[in-house]
From Swiss-Prot:
Enzyme kind, highest EC tier: ligase
GO biological process, one term: tRNA modification
Native organism: Clostridium tetani (strain Massachusetts / E88)
NCBIfam families: lysidine_TilS_C, lysidine_TilS_N
EC number: 6.3.4.19
Record-given protein name: tRNA(Ile)-lysidine synthase
Record: residues binding ATP: S26, G27, G28, P29, D30, S31
Domain notes: The N-terminal region contains the highly conserved SGGXDS motif, predicted to be a P-loop motif involved in ATP binding.
Originating gene: tilS
Length: 467
């Protein structure tokens, strides 16, 4: 058994020497086997192991006994132990989700809090090859695609690792018996009350008896084969994502050119965009990908509402995906103004404005960097200001003779409505000198006889965070 685990660890490069690892431990055979094996590898890999247990409050005294069993085991083997109690039944009812989903969410939340608290490297989970088979069969019955057929990943985000994913339940039970681990048994796993239990207790035994005795190994092999193709598609679509998408913590924009790619790539770009925005793909299904694909084919200004208060907007063929509350906060920036000084200025905690006087003009004056601009300092009257648009604002764009309403310019620039109150403006006195990211004013441009040059550079806290 330990050889199977070592082979999996080496194959996927799961663990490095000196890693600090959180191990999710329910007290059942799978997690106790995993914890015991990692304990045996502790000295060889110089591991720091933390056992994490969640009492789901679903099985009364049995659940309390599970927690006590894991705690005592950890004391015996000198393993750090942390536990929490979460009423999964109440959580499921409150969030209108299944017990299974609620349990998974609270487990991952607890594990990640511990990871941050103790600066851990990995989170080890106790899925095995039987779990893999059950998961893939359940996904097939839901009409899954390649992502689902690939099954549970052995390693995800270089954080979540599954060292016993290639071991069977029988091998795990034999290991527990050999080492007298006396793992706890959740009696509900032996009852056909959940869909997964029916797959485990009824469907798989039926297939084994009537079609293929090795169905678990066969399904696992299929998942591994498909995973190779999935990895390539992910690699190809990731490249396209960075080519065609921009993102902030508030929204992701998919350029219209992305929708000229093969549907397999475009679909993955959409999924990647949702994942970038909300951190996961829970409640986001194939039908929502199709909805966004159809939205892009429609007219500008149209939008759809997606799960978890997310909206998608067609803006001249580009698709903007954002949280509803972002668009609902329109106008909150109108009163935000800040006088800027020579040197570094911090705006709203996440935008930095650097201002300096210079006699040199670099190549980026020709527009190569939309967030660095030069102005004739001697033409400036009044304070240098940072603000957002106001009703009645007008602007004389570079090359224009007369002024134009900011509202009309934003339409010309194809800035979607929900972003227009977030476009930064640099003003000199009462005059708008720069619509950041778009245009500078004709009135303050640098000319041949300019003596003193003002250089302004604007940076977001993260890439693409300015608007």
């Amino acid at each position: 058994m330990i050889d199977i685990v070592l082979n999996t660890i080496h194959k996927y490069n799961m663990i490095n020497k000196g890693d600090k690892i959180i191990v999710g431990v329910s007290g059942g055979p799978d997690s106790m086997c995993l914890l015991h094996i990692l304990y045996r590898l502790r000295d060889e890999y110089n591991l720091n192991i933390i056992a994490a247990h969640i009492n789901h409050c679903l099985r009364g005294k049995d659940a309390d006994n599970d927690e006590k069993y894991v705690e005592n085991f950890c004391k015996k083997y000198d393993i750090d132990f942390y536990s929490t109690k979460i009423d999964v039944g109440k959580l499921a009812k409150k969030e209108n989700i299944s017990f299974e989903v609620a349990g998974r969410e609270c487990r991952y939340d607890f594990f990640n809090k511990l990871k941050l608290k103790f600066n851990c490297d990995k989170i080890a989970l106790a899925h095995n090859s039987n779990d893999q088979c059950e998961t893939i069969l359940m996904r097939i019955m839901r009409g899954t695609g390649i992502e689902g057929l690939a099954g549970i990943k052995a390693i995800r985000d270089n954080i979540y690792i599954r060292p016993i994913i290639e071991a069977s339940r029988k091998q795990i039970e034999d290991y527990c018996e050999e080492h007298e681990l006396e793992a706890r048994i959740d009696k509900t796993n032996l009852e056909s009350i959940y869909a997964r239990n029916k797959v485990r207790l009824e469907l798989i035994p039926y297939i084994q008896e009537n079609f293929n005795q090795d169905i678990i190994a066969v399904i696992n092999r299929m998942g591994n084969n498909i995973d190779v193709d999935r990895e390539y598609l992910d690699f190809a679509s990731d490249k396209k994502f960075y080519q065609f998408c921009t993102s902030t913590k508030y929204e992701v924009v998919i350029k219209k050119e992305a929708f000229l790619e093969h549907k397999a790539i475009t679909s993955r770009i959409i999924r990647r965009s949702i994942n970038r925005l909300k951190g996961n793909l829970y409640n986001f299904e194939r039908v929502h990908v199709e909805d966004i694909l159809n939205l892009q084919k429609g007219s500008t200004g149209k939008f759809i509402t997606l799960p978890e208060k997310i909206k998608a907007l067609n803006n001249y063929g580009d698709i903007h995906i954002f949280f509803e509350e972002f668009s609902d906060n329109k106008g909150e920036n109108k009163e935000k103004e800040q006088i800027l000084e020579i040197g570094n200025n911090i705006i709203n905690s996440n935008i930095k404005v650097q201002i300096e006087l210079t006699n040199e003009i670099h190549k980026d004056i020709m527009g190569k960097d939309v967030y660095v601009k030069y102005f004739d300092f001697d033409k400036i009257n009044g304070n240098i200001m940072f603000r957002y648009r106001k009703d009645g604002d007008r602007f004389t764009s570079l090359g224009m003779k007369g002024s134009k309403k900011i509202k009309d310019l934003f339409i010309d620039f194809k800035i979607p409505k929900h972003l227009r109150d977030y476009v930064p403006l640099i003003c000199f006195g009462n005059e708008i000198a720069w619509i950041v990211g778009y245009r500078i004013s004709e009135k303050f441009k640098v000319e041949k006889n300019t003596k003193n040059i003002l250089k302004i550079k604007i940076e977001g806290e993260k890439e693409n965070e300015l608007v």
